[in-house]
């Protein structure tokens, strides 16, 4: 019995030792202003799990939380931002976010309903020279592993407007993708969180999320 236990422990140790360490983490942005930056608790963990399975990435299973004045900001290739309410960047935070994005980082802003009027003026602090532009359906972000010929999937109805994907392009590079009237992050949450969401809606949201991660990592 003891011999069998040792063999089992040795086998498990071998598996643990052979498993590669995660290559990187995805982060959720903790911003100021009082908005619920922490919304959608299961979104990123579910997206990470999906990406690791579907894209064969090696992302750490637990999301990070990062503030714009944190030294480790530059270590995350993909930062996700969500919420319903107020957003406020200090001048220093806006400079740090600009440095992150112009240095190769990628920000996904997800309108969780009500974010639009707050986030647009704050992103103007970051890139006063840029405007959000709606990306054409031919953009590569819609054509990574998964094809979305009609753009973003519509997860929640909100005001009944069509889902739109906006981008900030810095020197030709997409540095920020803004999913509006879509609620992509809600679609990533555990099935059953929103009873009206079907498994098909959940799957479509995860596939689009995987495209975002794939694009952020390859910029292709």
PLM regions: where:
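Bacterial N-terminal signal peptides
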Residues: 4-16
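Aromatic-Pro/Gly-enriched surface loop or interdomain linker
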Residues: 17-78, 82-85, 183-184, 188-220
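An acidic, glycine-rich "communication" segment
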Residues: 25, 33-34, 42-43, 116-192, ...
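Short alpha-beta junction capping motif
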Residues: 26, 78-117
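Surface-exposed patches in mature extracellular/periplasmic domains of secreted proteins
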Residues: 58-67, 109-112, 130-138
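Alpha-helical scaffolding within the catalytic cores
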Residues: 61-68, 90-95, 160-164
């Amino acid at each position: 019995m003891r011999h069998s236990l040792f063999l089992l422990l040795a086998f498990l140790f071998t598996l643990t030792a052979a498993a590669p360490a995660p290559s990187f983490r995805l982060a959720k942005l903790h911003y100021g202003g009082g908005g619920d930056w922490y919304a959608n608790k299961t979104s990123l963990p579910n997206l990470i799990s999906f990406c690791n399975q579907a894209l064969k990435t090696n992302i750490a299973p637990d999301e990070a939380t990062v503030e714009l004045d944190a030294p480790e900001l530059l270590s995350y290739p993909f930062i996700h931002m969500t919420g319903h309410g107020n957003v406020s960047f200090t001048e220093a935070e806006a400079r740090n976010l600009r440095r992150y994005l112009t240095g190769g980082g990628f920000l996904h802003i997800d309108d969780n309903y009500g974010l639009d009027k707050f986030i647009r003026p704050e992103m103007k602090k970051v890139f006063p020279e840029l405007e959000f532009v709606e990306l054409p359906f031919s953009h590569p972000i819609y054509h990574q592993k998964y094809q979305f010929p009609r753009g973003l999937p519509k997860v929640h109805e909100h005001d009944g407007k069509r889902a739109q994907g906006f981008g900030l392009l810095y020197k030709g590079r997409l540095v920020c993708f803004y999913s509006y009237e879509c609620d992509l992050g809600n679609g990533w949450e555990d099935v059953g969180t929103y009873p009206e969401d079907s498994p098909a809606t959940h799957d479509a949201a995860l596939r689009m999320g995987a495209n975002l991660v794939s694009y952020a990592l390859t910029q292709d």
